[in-house]
Structures are given as C-alpha cells and as structure tokens.
Amino acid sequence: VLEYARRLSALQKKVADKIFMVMRVYTAKPRTNGDGYKGLVHQPDTSKAPSLINGLQAVRQLHYRVITETGLTTADEMLYPSNLVLVDDLVSYHAVGARSVEDQEHRFVASGIDAPVGMKNPTSGNLGVMFNGIYAAQNKQTFLFHGQEVETSGNPLAHVILRGAVNEYGKNEPNFYYETLLNAIERYEAMGLENPFILIDTNHDNSGKQYMEQIRIVRQTLQNRDWNEKIKKTVRGFMIESYLADGRQNQPEVFGCSITDPCLGWENTEALVEEIYATLTK
C-alpha cells in the first residue's frame, strides 16, 4: 500500500495543475452474504485469525503513514458509522456504499461530517434512494450516536457516486451513460441540493468488475463532458480501482495484487491518469 502511495504521490505532482487525487485506503469490505475477507479492520494479518482491536490500530496507522509519508489525502468507506470517531481526524473523504446508502444512521452521520461524503446508488440502481440519502445528509439532523443525543448542521458536500447496478436477472446495468448523467443532474436541480457533483465509479457494476473496462468508461465519460456543458460542470471526477499489479488474487501471493476487487495495475493506472490530464489540457 505504501509503495502504491509513493507512486501515486509522484504522479499527483506531475498533474497537479489539472487533477487532484485522493487515495482510496479502503479498510473495510462489505460482503453480499457475509463471507470472505472483510478488510484490514477485521483481519490486519491475513495469515491469522480476525482481530478487530488490532485491525482498528492498523487502520489508523495506515492512514497516518500514507498522509505523513506521501502528502496525499485519503478516502475510506464508512461501512461502520460507529468507527468514524476513530478516523475522523485522518480521513478526508468518506464514501457511503451501495448497501448502506438507504440506512438512516449512515445518512445522519454523514450529515455531521466536515468533509465530502460520496453516496453511491444502491445495487438496484434506484437513483431516488441515493438522492434521498444525499438530501438527508445535506440537512440538519438530530439522532443518537455513541449513546448521546447529537445535532448536526448538515453536510453541503454530500454528493453522487454512480457505480452501476444489477437487474433482477443478475445482469450488470451501467449508469455512466449520457442519458443517466442528465437524469441525475435534473434530480439535483429539482431537489435544490447544494454543490451538484457527480463521481463516476469506473469499476463495480459499471464495468462488471472487468477492470480493464475502466479505461473505456473514463474515455466515454470525458467525451460526454465535451458534448454537454451541464455534464462538464457537474461530472468532475472518477473513482478508479487500481493497485500495483493488474487483476486480483484469492491469497496474498503476488506483491501489489488486490485480494478483493480486480484492479488496474500501475502501468495502466499511470497511463490512464496521463490520458485524462492530456484531455483536460486540450
């Protein structure tokens, strides 16, 4: 992870006048049926039994080292809202995942975070669910948190992440297309939400977890931005899954290869960022 962070930091410096990168340091992995590796917070050493106490320490240490040793800011998924207090002083960007976006606690906690919170559409693809979550996060809330009654002022930086969907037949339905983007922008306008901002998640159900498809998705989205001024103004980022080696593996045997979702390797990542930079510089 730190080797990847060092490379990303060097690349960030090359493109800093057009691109701002936040490194995904995802430490908890949601599981559809509860099985499988659940991330650093659960199992900091994959050769040993799960240990949440050691995992929480490892999470803080990893975020801290990435930030202090590379100068990058970090992002993490807020899978467990109760853990926010353990990383709130370190993490600069929080994501609410597809399986959590409809949950009231996630929405209300997001309303009290003083950092951007990206909210993904649910796996069904229902944009209304996601926008209701953003509305809740952008407004004042009163609720119980860590055994205390808390009030929030709302988070004006809560925004959209489009990650694709799965239909009732189990087939992927991408939602980074031109018409979907315009639909999302119209919903932003109709609901009067602040700071309209859309991130495209280039993996997951947009790519069908075919990690090389991320390159095509980025290219098509950049074209859509060129064709429509509203899209250009609102679609302002990508969430790209990348690591040192292409693909994924079941066990940590190959250095720098993901043991969760398949990722772009470093060479492809660097080339893609440079391509984005060149497109934005035209």
Please provide the spans of the model-predicted regions.
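Active-site-facing alpha/beta catalytic cores
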Residues: 2-187, 204-220, 224-237, 242-252, ...
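Short, structured loop/turn "capping" segments at alpha-beta junctions
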Residues: 194-197
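Acidic, Ser/Thr-rich peripheral helices and adjacent loops at domain boundaries
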Residues: 250-263
